[in-house]
């Protein structure tokens, strides 16, 4: 009796400390059963389902006495309230006893094993067995009774012991002797805590978590599940599609860059034609080789760059830059001319006649060409007048360079003249009246082709002489003199190109070749006496 009162009092104190639970909820959910004092139990359930009616009635009687004694000790309880409470509790105990008496007895198969209550989780392929509904709530399901072995109890006790809170005592019920003894264990969680725990366990059981998604796949929007292998394939397809889009974007950008470059080349070619670069050629435009066409476009680009460098040189001289800064511009001009010599050397290996005939130059420039370029000695004569004042040592160096250039030019001219004579003799060998039917016609053409191949060697030697002359002149002059030298060369050829443009666009009424009758000497005399500026008054 004393043990029951002590247990009832401790249970009431713990219940008041945690949460005030009404008596009907205590009957619905019961108290928490334990297999041993050190083992934490599952969510609480009604232990009256498996207790005799007499034991239940005795328990409620002891509970009433404990409440009455506790209230008398405090001296704050109204006797009328005690009688009403006792009457209501007696009625509840009688109703519970009648409900238990009406149920059939439960067969105990293993009476020596302890029994604990465990909440059964609902899965897709499992069926709920032995569940009953509570009269207070139709949505709550009573937990099922499950027989467990001592080994399973010991295994689950370690996990449940981590959830215990020290300092709290609950009632422990065993099925062996129906004795009630206090023990230290975790307090009974509330209904909300049980619902949260059940929801968390269901999420873990039914595919919750990233690990299960990676292992078992995921669910699409249409509700169909996708396994992990399909997920990997879909991810690989998305990555391949992304890389394909990047390659396509780069390809489109390449095409756009090429289109812009082609438009620029066409504009440069049109500008070169407007400046008279292709006037009076020895061949039609359709007969021009691909290498020659490429050289013409590159030469037009070179002229544009040359005009920019001439502007920089003129600005540097007018601003009186330091020799260091001005020397950088001079070196760029020297490298720019070296680039032109490289372009000509590449074209000489494929089409040397395009260079020798001067088709790439304007008509006025073509008049002063010597073996496909400028004559070094003539250029030195022009520059000496533009480089004053010169020191005596510089004058000696320039005159020495001029003499060596003239000697090299004479040697190349003699060699080229001999080649022309030899080539003419080869072509004129045999009888010219017989035509292609001559027996040795093909052999003569083969010999002539070998001699024509020597033209490339002569042109390369002439270009090397021009390039070496510029480099030697750069070493003789100072930085400012070299800047004036390159500025004078560029301005000289710019004036020749301008002269060609003026000649190609001269007024047509000044042409004499259209006259049907040639004028006599007396008629030509007044024409020579006319002032020359009247012929180009429009310019």
From Swiss-Prot:
The keyword Nucleus applies. Keywords: DNA-binding, Nucleus, Plant defense, Transcription, Transcription regulation. Residues 255-269 are annotated as: Leucine-zipper. Residues 229-249 are annotated as: Basic motif. It comes from the Eukaryota. Residues 227-271 form the bZIP domain. GO terms for molecular function: DNA-binding transcription factor activity; sequence-specific DNA binding. SMART domains: BRLZ. It is found in: Nucleus. Its main location: nucleus. The keyword Secreted does not apply. InterPro entries: bZIP, bZIP_sf, TGA_domain. SUPFAM superfamilies: Leucine zipper domain. Transcriptional regulator involved in defense response. Acts as a transcriptional activator in vitro. This is Transcription factor LG2. It comes from Oryza sativa subsp. japonica (Rice). The lineage of its organism: Eukaryota, Viridiplantae, Streptophyta, Embryophyta, Tracheophyta.
